[in-house]
Amino acid sequence: MLFLFYPEGIPHSTLHQIEKISLTDSRVIINGPSGSGKELVARKIHKKSKRNNKAFIILNGALLDKEKYEAELFGLEKDDGSILYGALEKANKGTLLIDQVSEIPLEIQSKILRVLTDQKFKRVNGSNDVSVDVRLICSSSKDLKKEIEIGNFREDLFHRINVFEINIEPLNQRISDI
């Protein structure tokens, strides 16, 4: 199989998918092993979209424990009245990339599902709804269908985020990118 590669290291077939996806505001899941360029693809989708002049925020599901993840995603209202804005608010009108979405705890997955359904959420310790308009792109190095089978990932969330799917080959199969 022959692939044409561009200087940015994205196969021609993937660039064609990006062009199509960028014309929509739909959610995207990008699958591929670590280091294969999933973030690069997500950035390219954002850059070519109508949201390109707004924020592109990245939240890595593998790096945070449950309590920190919830605050990082939804924000936090402190006892003194101050607010720490989460990734959803920071990405409002722009794009949020949830990297390693498979690592998000199930309880938080259900809250993400609500955001996708209602376009609103509550900050940690908050009582008021916060409305957002965010394009969600998720990436994973795990097979989400297998994660669903073993009970680590919600099937309803999978169907909400999997409007478009991009599969990235490992770098060892893209020798010209190395």
Sequence positions of predicted segments:
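AAA+/P-loop NTPase substrate/partner-engagement loops
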Residues: R51-L73
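Short glycine/serine/threonine-enriched helix-capping/active-site loop
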Residues: L59, S139, I166
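Conserved AAA+/SF3 P-loop NTPase catalytic/coupling segment centered on the Walker-B
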Residues: V28-I30, K44, L64-A71, L84, ...
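Short clusters of hydrophobic/aromatic residues that line enzyme substrate/ligand-binding pockets
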Residues: L4-F5, L73, D79-D80, L88, ...
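Interfacial catalytic loop of ABC nucleotide-binding domains
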Residues: L59, L76, I83
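Nucleotide-binding/hydrolysis machinery
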Residues: F3-H12, H16-T24, V28, P33, ...
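Conserved glycine(s) of the Walker
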Residues: G37
